[in-house]
Amino acid sequence: MYFSQEGEGKHMSRPAVKVAIAGMAVGFIVMLLTLAIALGFKQEVRKTIIGFGSHIQVVNFDNNNTYQMQPIVASDSLINALQHVPYVTSVERFCTKPGIIKTDDAFQGIIIKGRESHGRDFFEQHLVEGHMPNKTNEVLISSTLAQLLKLKTNDRFFCYFIDSDVRARRYTITGLYDTRFSDYDELFIIGNMAEVQHLCGWEGNEVCGIELLLSDFSKLYEAADNVYDITANRPDAMGNLHYTQTVEELNPAIFSWLRLLDMNVVIIIILMLCVSGFCMISGLIILILDSVQMIGLMKALGATDRMLRKTFLYEAFFLIGKGMIWGNFIGVSLCLLQYFFHIVPLDSATYYVSYVPIALHPGAWILLNIGTLLLSMLVMLGPSAIVSKISPAKVMHFE
């Protein structure tokens, strides 16, 4: 078609074709980047929140959603039962205690958290200085908190815990972590679980709760239902009832924001599909109008409307495919550059991450390509009908 025509028609259609391909490519690049960034945000934010906590917590039913928790007795039999829940990869006891760090120049409210083992992997990944705590008087704090309090590795500080009386503990900083999640970095210090149990006045298996990690986030509520079935009618040794809560229930504002992000992605993809579709429709109409004489001649020689429409639809398929190839090449290249080099920074206090995160899953990428191709071809059916309106007699008479 446009690449085989000679003379004036060739020069008229070629710019229109280039614009159509460019419009398709730009639209696909925007859709690809939008999808990759949205998936990256969700993945990074979820990973950080779960790293500080877990997918599912089992706590005392009488808790009031604070870090000053009532204890449960997390028996070995309960731990063993929870370990057999489908999709559960780790079951750990944990303890938390609110306190206040006081230095010569400043003070800051904190939560000291002790857990058995799975948290070490997360904080070791985000360790920027020093090492993980090993003794009861050693703690890990964030570099953000260290900057606020003017502390550094190997410094010692007093932390005050207020119950019926005020108790002071002196801790040594063994290392600094940095997750770039400022809300939690300023709040949590990581210590020894036995030390936190002692601060709470508990012993043995008395803990704040049990944390469960899953292998698949999409199975969150299915796993939570199974955990509830095990714990709901199973009081502990002191008669306490259990309460099961998910990470989404513990962080409703953040996960509502992530769901709003999904809506934004849908809106952007729809807008870009409209823009790309408009470019392709315009390009196809120009190609058809530029080929009126050829269409009239082909009809005069016996070509049917169906045959000619299929010819132009094949041409549209070629143009869409070329635009998508360029869009994939440029879009994936930009994604890889951002993924490895973090070219575009962000304010972590506002966006919870310090750079634009990228996560492009193969399944999502394939679906985006297939969906874009099918929808683009679907909108081409309308303008291709122009072929059937062209009369050979009128074209020949005009000629």
Can you say where each PLM-predicted feature lies in the sequence?
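N-terminal Sec/SRP start-transfer signal
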Residues: 1-28, 399
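Peri-transmembrane interface segments
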Residues: 10-18, 223-226, 230-278, 287-289
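Hydrophobic, regular-secondary-structure patches
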Residues: 29, 36-111, 135
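Short helix-loop junctions at transmembrane helix boundaries
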Residues: 310, 325-370, 381-389
